[in-house]
């Protein structure tokens, strides 16, 4: 809207009325406000261009051709410690429009953007920054890990730096004093976890191995490692109490008990047996698989006798195959398992 016209009173004119004086003051206030807005407009960077001219897209394309001057200016402006909210918004708008050009070649530029002080800014800056992160990880997935690391870093309390003059005396060395207590607390929480929590943990890991067979080996290693740690940290009295409770609650002659035990034993032994028989596996893997099979067959009381005989027969046939390659045994051998 244009400002109202102001007329200067000549000596021969009549004196201005009070209402006219009031209107004149309001008009002068409006002109002052417009001049302030005009100054802010010229002092702030434009919304769709960078401060040194051109666009971010042009700067990125020039950088790929070897012209690095504008690119260095761009980095310096982003590293300005006194950067304003409006400037951050302008930069983010520019980068969002150039998201397809921000490839892995501009990893250094992305690291500078991720260090921008955006969290304690205005709500507009926060929303614009989050929108930029969403566009970035959607179009350039190579930057997903740095973005997640940056977001996670804001959940960590800042380190306390103790200074004497210009010398850093300590960089939060006192934080290490709590490490033993924190470790003991975490260990006690893990050891005192409810049985149902551990069962759900193992069950979900095994379900993941069904959906991702390529991760089955690593998942089984993880499960065995965690179970061994629980077994080592468990007290003897706790183990005896758990076994006694299991005998009291799970005893009986349920018709489905044998079928469930048979399915579990087969599911556990079959992958190990394949590992043992595969000559392409390293010797240490095959040896470990054999050790697990032997330990399982010798110590698991719930394994049906039929499975024991089948596995012993298969192992004897395999041993005969390795010791006498020219004379394969044609009839299955059975081991007397009455002593087990």
UniProtKB/Swiss-Prot annotation:
Phylogenetic classification of the source organism: Eukaryota, Metazoa, Chordata, Craniata, Vertebrata
Q: Name one GO cellular component term.
A: nucleus
* Taxonomic source organism: Homo sapiens (Human)
Gene responsible for this protein: RRN3P2
- Family to which this protein belongs: Belongs to the RRN3 family.
List the InterPro entries hit by this protein, alphabetically: RNA_pol_I_trans_ini_fac_RRN3 (IPR007991)
| GO biological process, any | transcription initiation at RNA polymerase I promoter
The protein's name is Putative RRN3-like protein RRN3P2
One example of the protein's molecular function in GO is: RNA polymerase I core binding
Q: Which domain of life is it from?
A: Eukaryota
